[in-house]
Swiss-Prot record:
UniProt-annotated binding residues for ATP: P117, T118, G119, S120, G121, K122, T123, L124
Chain positions recorded as Zn(2+) binding sites: C13, C16, C35, C38
Annotated InterPro entries: AAA+_ATPase, ATP-dep_Clp_protease_ClpX, ATPase_AAA_core, Clp_ATPase_C, Clp_protease_ATP-bd_su_ClpX, ClpX_bact, P-loop_NTPase, Znf_CppX_C4
Keywords of the record: ATP-binding, Chaperone, Metal-binding, Nucleotide-binding, Zinc
Residue ranges occupied by any ClpX-type ZB domain in the UniProt entry: 1-54
SUPFAM superfamilies noted in UniProt: Glucocorticoid receptor-like (DNA-binding domain), P-loop containing nucleoside triphosphate hydrolases
UniProt xrefs under HAMAP family: ClpX (MF_00175)
Classification via NCBIfam families: clpX (TIGR00382), PRK05342.1 (NF003745)
Family per similarity comment: Belongs to the ClpX chaperone family.
Biological source species: Moorella thermoacetica (strain ATCC 39073 / JCM 9320)
Record note on quaternary structure: Component of the ClpX-ClpP complex. Forms a hexameric ring that, in the presence of ATP, binds to fourteen ClpP subunits assembled into a disk-like structure with a central cavity, resembling the structure of eukaryotic proteasomes.
Pfam families linked to this entry: AAA_2, ClpB_D2-small, zf-C4_ClpX
The protein's name: ATP-dependent Clp protease ATP-binding subunit ClpX
Entry-linked CDD domains: RecA-like_ClpX
Length: 419
C-alpha cells in the first residue's frame, strides 16, 4: 500500500514522491496527492497530444475531389462554386501543413469571397467545409460591425466567436474558418472616398484588413468593447480562413456596363436584355467590378478567390427539398416517423412549394418557413391521435385549399382487405 507521508509524517506527492516542502503546492484528492510540477507535466502531455490531433496531416486532408463529393451530399447545384471552394480550401490547409515558407516560395493566404443571391447556399457551403475538415467555425454578420470607437461590434468580436466555437482552445481556433455574411452591406456608399466618416462601410473594411491578412489580434474574452484594464486573448489570424459572402444586388448591372462597353461598335453581337441570366453575368465578375461596387482596393486584394453562385431554379429547389442528407422533407418524415406516422409529399406539392419560394425571392432559405406554415396544424394534431397511420401533402394543401389527408389505421386495414 502506497504511503502518503515520509517517516516524519510529512506529506508527499503520490506521483513523483517529492515532499510537501520541496514543491510549491500539493493538491489533495481522494486518497492521493499531486504536486504542481506533476500537474504542469500532465498539462504538457495533454497539450502535445491535442496539438497532434489538430494538425491535418497530408494523408488525412481530403483531396479537392473528395471535398466536392461530400459537399454534393449537402448542397444541391452550384457545381462550379463547389469545385472552386474545394481547391481553395485544400490549398489553404496544405499551406498550413507544409509551412507557409518554402525554400524559394512564400505561399500567401487565399481568403474567399462568395457572390450569390439570398438562399443560394453560401452559408451552408462554408458550414459544410468546416464540418468536412473538422475545424472550428464561426458566422458573423458584417452589418453589425462598426470601426473602433463607435456604437456596434468591434471586428475582434468575430474572432471571439471562433474562440468560443473552439471551446477557448486558441491553437485550435487559429486553424478555423470564419464566414462573414452580408459583406456587400459594408461597401462604400459612393465610388468617391467620402469626406464624412463611413463607420459601418469603408471604416469596417479598413478594420477587417489586418485580421484578413494575418495579425496577432487582441480579443476581449467577454466580448464587447476593449478597455485598458482588461486581459486579452492573443490570437494569430495568419492561418484562419476567411470566407466573405453577400448577395451584391446591382453588381450585375456594373458588370453589364463594363462588358457592353467592349461589345459596342461594328461587328458586336446583338443580344436581348433578358438573354443572359444574372448568374451568368456574375460569373464574369472582375476585381474592378467589386471596386466600383464600393469595396476598397486593399479589401478586394485580401480576397483573391472569387466564387459565384447561381440563383436556384424550380428543379434545384425541389432537389433541395428531397435529396441532401439533411433535406427538409427527410427531416419532417423522421419527425412523423417518431409518432408512428408515414409522411408523404406528392410531386405537385413539392413543385408548388418550390414556386412559392421563388415568388418570395428567398431561395432555399425560405423553404423551411413555407413548410412550417403548411405543417403546423397537422404537427399539432397528430401527437394527440394514436389512430393515424399516414399523412399526405398535396398541391391543394400547400395552396391552403384543403387540409392534409390523414389515413387512419382502420382505413388502412380495410384497403388491405379489399386488395
Amino acid at each position: 500500500m502506497y504511503k502518503y507521508t515520509d517517516d516524519k509524517g510529512q506529506l508527499k506527492c503520490s506521483f513523483c514522491g517529492k515532499l510537501q516542502d520541496q514543491v510549491k503546492k500539493l493538491v489533495a484528492g481522494p486518497g492521493v496527492y499531486i504536486c504542481d510540477e506533476c500537474i504542469e507535466l500532465c498539462n504538457e502531455i495533454i497539450e502535445e497530444e491535442l496539438s497532434e490531433d489538430l494538425n491535418l496531416e497530408m494523408g488525412e486532408l481530403p483531396k479537392p475531389k473528395e471535398i466536392r463529393e461530400i459537399l454534393d451530399q449537402y448542397v444541391i447545384s452550384q457545381d462550379q462554386a463547389k469545385k472552386a471552394l474545394a481547391v481553395a480550401v485544400y490549398n489553404h490547409y496544405k499551406r498550413i501543413n507544409l509551412g507557409m515558407k518554402m525554400d524559394d516560395v512564400e505561399l500567401q493566404k487565399s481568403n474567399i469571397i462568395m457572390l450569390g443571391p439570398t438562399g443560394s447556399g453560401k452559408t451552408l457551403l462554408a458550414q459544410t467545409l468546416a464540418k468536412i475538415l473538422n475545424v472550428p467555425f464561426a458566422i458573423a454578420d458584417a452589418t453589425s460591425l462598426t470601426e473602433a470607437g463607435y456604437v456596434g461590434e468591434d471586428v475582434e468580436n468575430i474572432l471571439l466567436k471562433l474562440i468560443q466555437a473552439a471551446d477557448y482552445d486558441v491553437e485550435k481556433a487559429e486553424k478555423g474558418i470564419v464566414y462573414i455574411d452580408e459583406i456587400d452591406k459594408i461597401a462604400r456608399k459612393s465610388e468617391n472616398p467620402s469626406i464624412t466618416r463611413d463607420v459601418s462601410g469603408e471604416g469596417v473594411q479598413q478594420a477587417l484588413l489586418k485580421i484578413l491578412e494575418g495579425t496577432i489580434a487582441s480579443v476581449p474574452p467577454q466580448g464587447g468593447r476593449k478597455h485598458p484594464h482588461q486581459e486579452f486573448i492573443q490570437l494569430d489570424t495568419t492561418n484562419i480562413l476567411f470566407i466573405c459572402g453577400g448577395a451584391f444586388d446591382g453588381l450585375d448591372k456594373i458588370i453589364k456596363n463594363r462588358i457592353s462597353q467592349k461589345t459596342m461598335g461594328f461587328g458586336a453581337e446583338i443580344r436581348g436584355k433578358n438573354d443572359v441570366q444574372v448568374g451568368d453575368i456574375l460569373k464574369q465578375v472582375l476585381p474592378v467590378d467589386l471596386l466600383k461596387y464600393g469595396l476598397i482596393p486593399e479589401f478586394v486584394g485580401r480576397l483573391p478567390v472569387i466564387v459565384t453562385l447561381d440563383a436556384l431554379d424550380e428543379t434545384a429547389l425541389i432537389r433541395v427539398l428531397t435529396e441532401p442528407r439533411n433535406a427538409l422533407v427527410k427531416q419532417y418524415q423522421k419527425l412523423f416517423e417518431m409518432d408512428g406516422v408515414t409522411l408523404e409529399f406528392k410531386e405537385d406539392a413539392l413543385v408548388t412549394i418550390a414556386r412559392e419560394a421563388i415568388k418570395r425571392e428567398t431561395g432555399a432559405r425560405g423553404l423551411r418557413a413555407i413548410l412550417e406554415e403548411i405543417m403546423l396544424d397537422v404537427m399539432y394534431e397528430i401527437p394527440s391521435r394514436n389512430n393515424i397511420s399516414k399523412c399526405i401533402i398535396t398541391k391543394d394543401v400547400v395552396l391552403r385549399k384543403e387540409e392534409p389527408l390523414l389515413l387512419t389505421v382502420e382505413r388502412k386495414k380495410k384497403k388491405e382487405e379489399t386488395a
